[in-house]
Structures are given as C-alpha cells and as structure tokens.
Amino acid sequence: MGARENSSGGNNHYFKVSGSGLLYQSSREPKEGFEEHISEKTGAVSYWRVFWNGIEGYLSDINVREMDFNGIKAKYVSIKISDEDGNYFINVPLMTQKGGINSYVKSLVRYLPNIDLKRKVVINPAHARKGDQYAPGNFFISYARETPDGKDELIQQYYKNGQNGWPDRVESTDIMGNKKFDYTAQDTFAFQVFKQYLEKFKAENEKSEQNRGQSIGATPTAQTPPPSYATQAPSQTPPPSYQQ
C-alpha cells in the first residue's frame, strides 16, 4: 500500500525529510490534502503533505543522484520502496555541510545487512522530540505487519555500538576545554559498506532489466521482490573501533 496515508498522483511518488524528521511531499502550488508551510529561514511559502506513518513496500533500489533544490546542486541518496501500486522515493542528502556522511545515510547502512528484501518493510524517520527543533536524524525500519490488527516488527540494526566493526565517534577536547567529536573513521566505514550495497542493487536491477527485455512478447508474470543479500564485510579493512 506504499504510503500509509493515501498518496495521490502517478505511479512514482517523491518524499523529503524535514529538519524535524517529518516525511513529506511538497508543492509550490496549493493541492488537495496539502497544507500551507512557511519556511522559518526564508519565509518562502510552499505546500506540504506529511506522512506520519511512513512508507510501506519492498526495498527495491538505492542510488545516488545529483539534484537541484532551490538552485543548489547536491548529491542525494534515493531510497526506492516499491509495491503493486507504484514506487516511492525518499531522498536525503549524501553529505553534511561539514563534509561528513549524512546521519540518515548512516542510519540506513546500520540496517542494510539485516533487511530481508523478500519482505515488505516500513521506513519512517524519527521525529523531533517535544521541545527540540531538530530530529535525531535516523530512520526506523521495520517489517510490515502481515494482518490489519498485527504489529510492525522493528528490524535490529546490524551495525551499532561498535558491533561488527562499526567505529564509535572519537571524543576530544579543544583548547578552550569544549568537547568535540570526530566521525571520520565512522564515516569512512559507513561509506565503504554503502558503496557495496549500491553495486549490489545496480547489478540486480541490470539483471532484472535484461530479463524483462528477453521476456517481451511473453505472457506477463507477477513481479517478485529482489532477493536478500548475504551480509559481507567492507572490501577494505575497516578503521578500528573506538571506545568512548
């Protein structure tokens, strides 16, 4: 059922994540189901439709695209969720303004080895806590409930708290006595894992395209979700894990 609230439009639907962790679609013009949104930074008026309950479907692709938002070009990670009704793309920046890996991308990487691609998932960003301006910057990814009265099953993160080679942040103190954190080792490790999955999805989708081309003219068959990928360590030796 894709978006757990009805999402009007064609077969492709595009979503962003706000600073407060809201999953939303936006429009420059008024639309049914969209509410006026005024940017606190610029005062610009747009129209948002928020999807509080996330996106449901099969994780069918992850890729990196260069996009132009408000005249600024940047690389975005596009997370593609698919079901029988269409495709749903969640776009988040690949990098931070300081040159690190975006926290949503690292959050996705933490889950990837444990996601069974043959099962429907639900993906939803964590929302900002009451009184906080910004969200923590991570996703919740669960297996979708199988019955209307069932419950989603939260997927365990494969990489967390130094497990499976995931480096902790490195804490230090500047000359003024203020604490600061270095994420270089963590970002390097996360990006190596991320690149492996980009290649896996690319290879699988190319294979699917070839099979689709060979089957032109044949009796159509129902599409099946992509196979689950076996967990592999990064191709390069990961940086050491640091204890806080």
Name each model feature, range by range.
Residues 214-244:
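Intrinsically disordered, low-complexity repeat regions enriched in Pro/Gln/Gly/Tyr
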Residues 1-95, 100, 105-113, 128-176, ...:
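OB-fold ssDNA-binding interfaces and closely related basic DNA-contact patches used
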